[in-house]
């Protein structure tokens, strides 16, 4: 029996967040960072190589794989096929990646006046991670799910004082 545990679990062992708020004269500023550590992402080796006519191959895989016509021994990915390949679909540390990340989840800047406040808010603005294939917050799999959307809002809040 030569099996052993590798990497970290696919559920983060550490999740964290922090975010201060500041006011200076008529301006306010707040942000929130969220992150995860001690987590692995298992890229699904089956999905890109699935059944004929049912799936597409991610571009980064299609650009760098071994084939008989392109026998690049330094290719990043194993051979492609329209059918299941036993050598490509077995669980392997080849598909395991570090899934740690730090995200700037929210940032808001506002200007306060006596009767109103104007603000600009952004969500999911930046991601810092060694994992570059898809949003690491999506976790393991194929990366073909919808990622967290980046959102920008501009708003005005009015106050009526008696």
Task: Describe each model-derived feature in a short phrase.
Residues 1-10, 70:
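Conserved small-residue
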Residues 12-16, 96, 100-105, 148-152:
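Residues that define the transmembrane beta-barrel architecture of outer-membrane proteins
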Residues 19-23, 32, 110-112, 145, ...:
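Transmembrane beta-barrel domains of outer membrane proteins
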Residues 24-26, 35-39, 106, 122-129, ...:
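Transmembrane beta-strands of outer-membrane beta-barrel pores
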Residues 26-29, 115-116:
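Repeated loop/turn-to-beta-strand initiation elements of outer-membrane beta-barrel proteins
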Residues 31, 118-120, 156:
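Membrane-embedded beta-strand positions of outer-membrane beta-barrel proteins
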Residues 36-117, 122:
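Extracytoplasmic gating/loop element in the C-terminal half of outer-membrane beta-barrel translocons
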Residues 65-72, 76, 89, 127-162:
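C-terminal beta-signal and terminal closure region of outer-membrane beta-barrel proteins
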């Amino acid at each position: 029996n030569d099996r052993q545990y590798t990497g970290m679990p696919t559920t983060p062992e550490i999740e964290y967040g922090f975010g201060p708020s500041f006011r200076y004269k008529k301006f306010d500023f707040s942000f929130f960072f969220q992150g995860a550590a001690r987590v692995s992402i298992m890229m699904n080796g089956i999905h890109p190589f699935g059944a004929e006519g049912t799936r597409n191959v991610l571009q980064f895989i299609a650009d760098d794989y071994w084939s008989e016509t392109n026998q690049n021994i330094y290719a990043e990915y194993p051979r492609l096929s329209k059918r299941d390949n036993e050598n490509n679909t077995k669980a392997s540390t080849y598909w395991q990646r570090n899934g740690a990340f730090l995200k700037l989840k929210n940032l808001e800047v506002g200007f306060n006046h006596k009767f109103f406040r104007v603000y600009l808010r952004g969500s999911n603005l930046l991601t810092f991670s060694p994992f570059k294939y898809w949003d690491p917050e999506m976790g393991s799999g194929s990366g073909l799910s919808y990622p967290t959307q980046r959102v920008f809002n501009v708003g005005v809040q009015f106050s009526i004082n008696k």
